[in-house]
Design a protein with these regions (language model features):
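Venus flytrap/periplasmic-binding-protein-like
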Residues: 166, 206, 217-234
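N-terminal helix-turn-helix DNA-binding module of bacterial transcription factors
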Residues: 1-25
Length: 234
C-alpha cells in the first residue's frame, strides 16, 4: 500500500496520474443535457430528476446547451467519449439522428432518432381540454401568448383551434421577442394596443401568464372576470 501511494504521488507531481489511473466512480452516474436551467420549467424538471435519482443512490450531472444544437452535440460527445457516465438523458434535444454510441441514451421530448429509449411529452390532450372548457363556457374569442421558443405550442394551439372553433383567431395571437414575465407583459400589451381583446388566453407557460396578468391588472382589466387565462407549463 505504501509503494502504491508513493507511485500515485510521483504520478500526480508529474501530471500523469489520470492517464494511468482509471478507477470507476462508485455511484451510478447520469448525465442530463437540457436546453437551459434558468427557466422554472427546466429547473424544476432537473431538480425533480435529481431527487429521484439520488434517492436511488445515483448521481446526476447537469449540462445546459442554451438551445444550441451544436452545444448539445458537443456535450453529448463529451459524455459519450470522455467521461465515465452510465446513462445520458437528453431533454427537448434538437431534432437529430444519433451516431452509434456505447453509453445508453434516453431522449425526453424532441425528435431524436437512434436513442435507446424515447419518452414523448404530449401536452395536446390538456390543450384540447382547456379549449373545450372555454367552448362549453360560451367563450369564442380565444387567443394565445407565446415567445420565440414556444413555436411548437403555438402550432398545437392552431391545430386544435381549427378543429374545435374554426374561424379567425389569428388576431388574438401575440408572440413576444422577450421571455418569461417580461414576454407575457409585452405580448398582452401588444394585444391590448390592437384594440380588441379575446375572451380567454392560452399562455405557452406560466411565467408568460403571470406577466400578462400583471399588464391586465395595471390597466384595469380583471382576471378572470373580463378575460380568462390558462398557462400550460408542465
Amino acid at each position: 500500500e505504501q509503494t502504491r501511494e508513493e507511485i500515485f504521488r510521483v504520478a500526480r507531481e508529474n501530471g500523469c496520474f489520470k492517464k494511468f489511473f482509471n478507477a470507476k466512480y462508485p455511484k451510478f452516474t447520469v448525465a442530463l443535457i437540457c436546453p437551459e436551467v434558468h427557466s422554472q420549467h427546466y429547473s424544476e424538471l432537473c431538480f425533480a430528476l435529481q431527487r429521484r435519482l439520488q434517492a436511488g443512490g445515483c448521481e446526476l450531472c447537469i449540462s445546459s446547451s442554451n438551445f444550441s444544437a451544436e452545444a448539445a452535440a458537443d456535450r453529448l460527445d463529451y459524455y459519450e467519449k470522455y467521461s465515465s457516465t452510465d446513462v445520458i438523458i437528453l431533454i427537448d434535444a434538437p431534432d437529430t439522428v444519433l451516431a452509434p454510441h456505447e453509453t445508453p441514451i434516453v431522449a425526453v421530448g424532441g425528435e431524436v432518432k437512434n436513442a435507446d429509449a424515447v419518452i414523448t411529452l404530449d401536452y395536446e390532450p390538456a390543450l384540447r381540454e382547456a379549449l373545450l372548457y372555454f367552448k362549453k363556457s360560451g367563450l369564442s374569442g380565444i387567443g394565445f401568448i407565446g415567445e420565440a421558443r414556444t413555436v411548437s405550442k403555438l402550432a398545437a394551439f392552431k391545430r386544435n383551434m381549427n378543429g374545435i372553433f374554426g374561424g379567425d383567431f389569428e388576431k388574438y395571437i401575440s408572440v413576444s421577442e422577450l421571455r418569461f414575465e417580461k414576454g407575457g407583459y409585452a405580448a398582452a400589451k401588444a394585444l391590448y394596443q390592437r384594440g380588441s381583446l379575446p375572451d380567454a388566453l392560452i399562455c405557452a407557460y406560466d411565467d408568460l401568464a403571470l406577466g400578462a396578468m400583471r399588464f391586465f391588472y395595471e390597466n384595469g382589466i380583471s382576471v378572470p372576470e373580463k378575460i380568462k387565462i390558462i398557462g400550460m407549463d408542465n
